[in-house]
């Protein structure tokens, strides 16, 4: 046990945290995860890998914590003495960041600083490697397409602005203190573990529910927004690969393929056996089930963002050349996988 690498994951109960914890355990690590205290259970994504801490073979441990509490983070880092820290915790919903801009800045921006300071104060600079979950939302009103590590940033939300501070403070601590600290600029990555408030999961869950007669209509905002969507399981491997390099750096992880929300909707419903036909324009546009003529998709202006990000498309050439990382799952296969999982869940047959 003492010869094993030790990893600390903030945001371990999220989509990426769950996949990353599973990967690290498979790689032989001792894994510590930080989770926020909640009045309801929030560990569903990691229940299959959790071990009772009194089990002599246990290698996965949870700690209560919060990115807004510096003394708490300092204590956890001191207790765990990690070889690698993966900072995935964040208020990561773009729309919500417009409603909670101060909290988003506190958790996402200053929270990253708190974690870096814990490493520095505890004298772990030469021991601990740091991964920061950055985001393609940094590019916002993209100045060029596709976007790579040298593309100028233009954040278009409080979330993206907070993540921009986090990005640069990681670069600053890397240069000022010699930390092995890397930014992963990850484009959108989804999975059956994606939260239901994110658009891909909202779409696949609704398509499944509508096909089973459990929901009437799916309401969406900008149908023409385009994103570069990949599979989260493949992206967390890229995170791990960054921390295995001799030198730290910043890397884009992306598929290099862009897909509109509209197309993702069509694929999701197609997996349930339904064909969507579009009628109307603008906020009056609707998606009709071709077989029945019933409206199953509608536009709701409340889901438009105050400042939209219309097109994000990533260039992961550096990650391919330096890390040897590449995506494998197509966005269409990803959509179908998510729908199948949602159908199983709603039918009560998911294992």
Curated annotation (Swiss-Prot):
Gene Ontology molecular function: GDP-mannose 4,6-dehydratase activity; NADP+ binding
Pathway where this protein functions: Nucleotide-sugar biosynthesis; GDP-L-fucose biosynthesis via de novo pathway; GDP-L-fucose from GDP-alpha-D-mannose: step 1/2
Source species, domain of life: Bacteria
Catalytic activity: GDP-alpha-D-mannose = GDP-4-dehydro-alpha-D-rhamnose + H2O
InterPro entries: GDP_Man_deHydtase, NAD(P)-bd_dom, NAD(P)-bd_dom_sf
CDD domains: GDP_MD_SDR_e
Catalytic residues in the record: 135, 137, 159
Cofactor needs: NADP(+)
Keywords attached to this entry: Lyase, NAD, Nodulation, Plasmid
Pfam family, one: GDP_Man_Dehyd
Family (UniProt): Belongs to the NAD(P)-dependent epimerase/dehydratase family. GDP-mannose 4,6-dehydratase subfamily.
Entry-linked HAMAP family: GDP_Man_dehydratase (MF_00955)
Protein name as catalogued: GDP-mannose 4,6-dehydratase
Organism: Sinorhizobium fredii (strain NBRC 101917 / NGR234)
């Amino acid at each position: 046990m003492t010869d094993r690498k030790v990893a600390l994951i903030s945001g371990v109960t999220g989509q990426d945290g769950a996949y990353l914890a599973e990967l690290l355990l498979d790689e032989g690590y001792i894994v510590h995860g930080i989770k926020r205290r909640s009045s309801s259970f929030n560990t569903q994504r990691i229940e299959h890998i959790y071990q009772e801490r009194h089990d002599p073979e246990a290698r996965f441990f949870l700690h209560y914590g919060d990115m807004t509490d510096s003394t708490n983070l300092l204590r956890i880092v001191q207790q765990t003495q990690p070889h690698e820290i993966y900072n995935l915790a964040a208020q990561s919903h773009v729309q919500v960041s417009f409603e909670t801009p101060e909290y988003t800045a506190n958790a996402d921006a200053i929270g990253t600083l708190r974690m870096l300071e814990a490493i520095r104060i505890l004298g772990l600079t030469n021991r601990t490697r740091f991964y920061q979950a950055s985001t393609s939302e940094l590019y916002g009103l993209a100045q060029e397409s596709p976007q790579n590590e040298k593309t100028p940033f233009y954040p278009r939300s409080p979330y993206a602005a907070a993540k921009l501070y986090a990005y640069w403070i990681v670069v600053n601590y890397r240069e000022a203190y010699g930390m092995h600290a890397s930014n992963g600029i990850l484009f959108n990555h989804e999975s059956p573990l994606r939260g239901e408030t994110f658009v891909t999961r909202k779409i696949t869950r609704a398509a499944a529910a509508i096909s089973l007669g459990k929901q009437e209509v799916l309401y969406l905002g900008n149908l023409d927004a385009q994103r570069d969507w990949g599979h989260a399981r493949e992206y967390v491997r890229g995170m791990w690969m960054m921390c295995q390099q001799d030198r730290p750096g910043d890397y884009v992880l992306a598929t290099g393929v862009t897909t509109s929300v509209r197309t993702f909707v069509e694929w999701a419903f197609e997996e349930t056996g339904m064909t969507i036909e579009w009628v109307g324009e603008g906020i009056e546009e609707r998606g009709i089930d071709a077989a029945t003529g019933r409206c199953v998709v509608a536009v709701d202006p409340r889901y438009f963002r105050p400042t939209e990000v219309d097109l994000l498309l990533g260039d992961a050439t550096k990650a391919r050349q330096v890390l040897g990382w590449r995506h494998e799952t197509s966005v269409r296969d990803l959509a179908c996988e998510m729908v199948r999982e949602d159908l199983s869940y709603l039918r009560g047959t998911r294992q």
